[in-house]
């Protein structure tokens, strides 16, 4: 079992093309990991992009402010982009993974013009709530375990949402679509290379049946 600081150190040290899946069971855990990841990037000549779907834009902005990120000023400086899932992941009820990938490339290119890299974080709850799980898997596998875009990315999954919508069976396929996996749950916190994760690791750490 890892101490909390190790997960923070891991996300802060992520490198371009790293593609990480992050399972959490509380909002506090989500914010602690994702905001540490983005804030460290902002301090290291990287832009930050965040896609909301579990919480609203206003909620995320307020949580970032509470964490210590000056949202308004960072947006004015052109270093922070916060988007809602509607129009990004799902548009007019459809998921077009090619369009999503192009969107990430556009943001990367925009930041590159300002001499910045890119750290991106996305809440993935919308795919479960809108029954777009097959499309989600296509998107995650299209990103590849090692990203084609030289950005660092964390795809964030609330375990409670997965359980409530009855999709625990896709947790392992989702893990395999990424290079690394972070688990924070009732059984503790762990970081794995995705090929080393077994069903019993997920069940022990998150206390779910896969």
Provide a role label for each language-model segment.
Residues 1-210:
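Non-catalytic regulatory/interaction regions at protein termini and inter-domain linkers
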């Amino acid at each position: 079992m890892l101490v909390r600081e190790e997960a923070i150190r891991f996300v802060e040290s992520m490198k371009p093309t790293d593609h990480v899946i992050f399972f959490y069971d509380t909002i506090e855990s989500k914010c602690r990991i994702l905001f540490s990841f983005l804030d460290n990037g902002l301090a290291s000549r990287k832009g930050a992009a965040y896609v909301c779907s579990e919480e609203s834009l206003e909620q995320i902005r307020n949580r970032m402010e509470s964490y210590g990120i000056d949202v308004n000023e960072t947006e004015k400086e052109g270093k922070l982009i916060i988007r809602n899932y509607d129009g990004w992941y799902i548009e007019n009820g459809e998921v077009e993974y090619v369009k999503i990938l192009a969107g990430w490339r556009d943001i990367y290119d925009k930041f590159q013009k300002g001499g910045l890299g890119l750290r991106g974080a996305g809440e993935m709850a919308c795919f479960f709530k809108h029954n777009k799980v097959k499309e989600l898997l296509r998107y995650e596998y299209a990103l590849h375990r090692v990203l084609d875009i030289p950005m660092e990315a964390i795809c964030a999954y609330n375990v409670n949402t997965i359980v409530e919508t009855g999709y625990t069976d896709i947790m392992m396929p989702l893990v395999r679509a990424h290079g690394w996996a972070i688990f924070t749950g009732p059984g503790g916190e762990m970081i794995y290379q995705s090929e080393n994760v077994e069903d019993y690791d997920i069940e022990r750490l998150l206390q779910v049946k896969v």
